[in-house]
Amino acid sequence: MKKLKRFIIVLLVLIATFVVYVEIVNRNSINMTYRQKLLKAVYPALMWFTKLTGKNTKELAGNKQPPVSFYSLKGQLNNGDTLDFAELKGKKVMLVNTASDCGYTNQYTDLQKLADEYKDKLIILGFPANDFKDQEKGTDEEIATFCKKNYGVTFPLMQKSTVIQ
């Protein structure tokens, strides 16, 4: 019985410590749900585990050409403006599927660092989508505000789109 009580006390102390850690990590976060705060706090461990296990890494092979050039396409920015991808010629372009309520939401921090560091050579385009377990429920305006306030995102975000049809 004493061991059980000791175990429960240790468990409660660990939980309380983790709750305090989550609050400290998110002290400057604005309008985040507790789930978003929790995911932001555990993101470094999630990324470490992902790298350790080799999950989410894929190398594409083959010489298959796309039916149309990327630079012949246009997209809608989340403010309603049209982005002509021809304007991006001469730069590397990174397309990223994003969501504000998933385990990888903190990737916005790293993406913004990349955008800042390579601003003359790299364009990052964020494509928010709600296809995966309702992880992007907000409107385009809410998404943009969330990303700017909590992660300092300045790279272009496209209109919320559908990845899976």
Language model region names:
Residues M1-L14:
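N-terminal Sec-pathway targeting helices
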Residues A16-R35:
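Membrane-interface motif at the C-terminal end of an N-terminal transmembrane signal
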Residues I30-L52, G138-D140:
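Periplasmic c-type cytochrome electron-transfer domains
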Residues Y43-A86:
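N-terminal "domain-start" segment that seeds a small globular fold
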Residues G90-V93, L122:
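Alpha/beta-hydrolase fold active-site loops
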Residues K91, T98-D101, P128:
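Short pre-active-site segment immediately N-terminal to redox-active cysteine/selenocysteine motifs
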Residues Y104-Q165:
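Structural microenvironment flanking redox-active thiols in thiol-disulfide oxidoreductases
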